[in-house]
């Protein structure tokens, strides 16, 4: 994976803070990727988000493959203590996101503008149909309502002729606002920072707020209420204007029981929406994550024996070009879709498609270096005999020492685990890989992450040593990931010698050293 060098003229001096959202379970892949691709430092994580510092420019950050969305970080802090505060106090605490440190907002806006100005393929984030934050039905997240614009006009009329300080002191009883003299002093102290910004640009800025509330926060305050409070605070503090339909900028806020995060999306479309994939099958971030641990090397033959629309092959070929790829499937419709994807991506010369059953591949034994595949989730293949015959055929065509990465449903994963033999050590010290990242249980602590208790490990760590699915296939590591409505497991195996090469010899400790290093990385709470 090549490290992208940033244009010296576009680097944030000394590095800037960003965060990416990620599918649950993909945090370790994203942490490793930002370090390798962006030379990122201060890499931290929480469930679904990875924070990092980098000097990379926007074109470099656009190359991230395991991330969903990319944001400039404005603020991250401990959660609002909703259980100990009444609603008015909670709303007042939310105003402090803006009022306590307006300089951080101006710095983030300045960075956002700078990154977009230096992007050769600049996106217009203010397009009418732009919606940089995908919303799911049923989630409590909203944009500032039209009422915000009405209130803005009312306040302008009411406060005409009053000083900015008088405006800051006037709160709305409906929202439980209570701006204090201390906050006013903070505003004065930060006035030098505000003056340093381009005043005209700030006044002309239009915005909207997208707020997501989860956990207990959701029970006390709605996303709409939170968005209104932040929106009004921004209008009073900076003179910005709310624009629901065509804003210059969108502010994203997530309030949960574990953290409060505020940021600015850098791109209109998600990073996970690949421009080179015409018809999506498996989610591209999952496909890339699978390929990233498959030990693909130049000159290798990589096979997906159940390729479907070819997403895994396309993702791998985009990242590792000097490799020959082959995809097989029994469905004519799937192969036609895969062919369209290959043409759209310009990869027809490097990926060959053939119609074949996964249980009867037209390939010589030990002819394949890497196998990567998404095993159908019980819709086409039954547990037991079918999955066993599939794995036996994959084992046959995979060379000794070759890697196999499979995406397994929970049922398939459980079946292979239950059918496994005795425990097999994966390293000389008997270590196994943990499928899920762990965060601190105590958000007030700093330093090294807490060590999981035996009961926690028992519930989260699958005994990979028991997952010896077939003959010479030895388990290496496993990661539990979310596919949206369901969960799955990314499982990696290596093929041992038929004569009995031990799993410890087959296993490469470097992979676990890397994962262990990521698991020791600080969580969000370490830096709060």
From Swiss-Prot:
Q: Give a Pfam family name.
A: UPF0020
* Compartments where found: Nucleus
Basic and acidic residues composition bias: which ranges?
A: 154-168
Q: What positions does the domain THUMP occupy?
A: 162-266
Q: Name the reaction it catalyses.
A: guanosine in U6 snRNA + S-adenosyl-L-methionine = N(2)-methylguanosine in U6 snRNA + S-adenosyl-L-homocysteine + H(+)
The primary site where this protein sits is: nucleus
Quote the Gene3D superfamilies the UniProt record gives. Answer: 3.30.2130.30, Vaccinia Virus protein VP39
Q: According to the UniProt record, where is the region Disordered?
A: 154-200, 437-460
User: Which PROSITE patterns is this protein grouped with?
Assistant: THUMP
Per the record, the GO terms for biological process are: methylation; regulation of alternative mRNA splicing, via spliceosome; RNA processing
Cross-referenced CDD domains: AdoMet_MTases, THUMP_AdoMetMT
**Enzyme's top EC category:** transferase
Tagged with keyword Nucleus? yes
Keywords attached to this entry:
Methyltransferase, Nucleus, RNA-binding, Transferase
GO cellular component assignments: nucleus; tRNA methyltransferase complex
Q: What EC number(s) is this enzyme filed under? A: 2.1.1.-
Q: Which InterPro entries match?
A: RlmKL-like_Mtase, SAM-dependent_MTases_sf, THUMP_dom
The record's subunit annotation is: Part of the heterodimeric THUMPD2-TRM112 methyltransferase complex; this complex forms an active tRNA methyltransferase, where TRMT112 acts as an activator of the catalytic subunit THUMPD2.
Give the protein family.
Belongs to the methyltransferase superfamily.
Q: What does this protein do?
A: Catalytic subunit of the THUMPD2-TRM112 methyltransferase complex, that specifically mediates the S-adenosyl-L-methionine-dependent N(2)-methylation of guanosine nucleotides, most probably at position 72 (m2G72), in the U6snRNA of the major spliceosome. This modification in the U6 snRNA affects the constitutive splicing efficiency of introns that have suboptimal splice sites and can impact final mRNA levels.
**Know the name of this protein?**
U6 snRNA (guanine-N(2))-methyltransferase THUMPD2
Organism of this sequence = Mus musculus (Mouse)
Tell me the lineage of the source organism.
Eukaryota, Metazoa, Chordata, Craniata, Vertebrata
């Amino acid at each position: 994976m090549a490290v992208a060098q940033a244009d010296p003229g576009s680097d944030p001096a000394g590095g800037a803070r960003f965060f990416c959202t990620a599918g649950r379970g993909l945090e370790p892949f994203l942490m490793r990727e930002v370090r390798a691709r962006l030379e990122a430092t201060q890499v931290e994580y929480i469930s679904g988000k990875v924070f990092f510092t980098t000097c990379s420019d926007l074109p470099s950050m656009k190359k991230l493959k395991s991330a969903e969305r990319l944001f400039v970080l404005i603020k991250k802090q401990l959660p609002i203590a909703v259980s100990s505060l009444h609603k008015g106090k909670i709303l007042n605490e939310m105003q402090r996101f803006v009022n306590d440190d307006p300089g951080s907002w101006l710095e983030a806006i300045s960075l956002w503008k700078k990154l977009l100005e230096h992007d050769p393929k600049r996106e217009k984030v203010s397009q009418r149909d732009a919606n940089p934050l995908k919303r799911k039905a049923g989630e409590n997240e909203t944009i500032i309502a039209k009422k915000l614009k009405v209130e803005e006009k009312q306040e302008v009329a009411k406060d005409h002729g009053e000083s900015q300080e008088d405006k800051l002191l006037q709160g709305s009883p409906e929202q439980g606002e209570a701006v204090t003299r201390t906050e006013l002093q903070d505003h004065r102290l930060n006035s030098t920072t505000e003056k340093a910004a381009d005043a005209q640009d700030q006044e002309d800025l239009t915005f909207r707020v997208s707020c997501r509330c989860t956990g207990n926060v959701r029970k006390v305050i709605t996303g709409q209420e939170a968005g209104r409070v932040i929106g009004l605070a921004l209008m009073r503090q900076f003179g910005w204007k709310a624009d629901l339909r065509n804003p210059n900028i969108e502010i994203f806020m997530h309030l949960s029981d574990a953290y409060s995060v505020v940021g600015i999306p850098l791109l209109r479309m998600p990073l996970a929406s690949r421009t080179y994939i015409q018809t999506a099958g498996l989610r591209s971030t999952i496909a890339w994550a699978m390929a990233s641990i498959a030990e693909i090397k130049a000159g290798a033959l990589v096979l997906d024996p159940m390729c479907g629309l070819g997403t895994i092959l396309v993702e791998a070929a985009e990242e590792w070009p000097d490799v020959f790829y082959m995809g097989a499937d029994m469905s004519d419709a799937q192969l036609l879709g895969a062919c369209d994807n290959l043409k759209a991506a310009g990869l027809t010369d490097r990926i060959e498609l053939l119609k074949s059953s996964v249980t009867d591949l037209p390939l010589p034994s030990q002819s394949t270096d890497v196998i990567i595949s998404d095993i159908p989730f019980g819709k086409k293949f039954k547990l037991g005999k079918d999955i066993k015959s599939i794995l036996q055929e994959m084992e046959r065509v995979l060379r000794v020492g070759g890697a196999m990465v499979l995406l397994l449903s929970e049922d398939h994963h459980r079946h292979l685990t239950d059918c496994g033999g005795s425990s097999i050590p994966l390293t000389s010290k008997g270590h196994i890989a943990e499928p899920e990242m762990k965060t601190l249980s105590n958000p007030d602590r700093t330093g090294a992450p807490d060590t999981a208790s035996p009961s926690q490990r028992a519930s989260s760590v699958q005994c990979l040593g028991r997952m010896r699915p077939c003959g010479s296939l030895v388990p290496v590591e496993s990661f539990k990931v979310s596919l949206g409505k369901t969960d799955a497991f990314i499982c990696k195996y290596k093929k041992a010698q038929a004569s009995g090469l031990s799993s410890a010899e087959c296993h490469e400790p470097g992979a676990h050293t890397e994962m262990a290093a990521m698991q020791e990385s600080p969580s969000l709470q370490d830096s709060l």
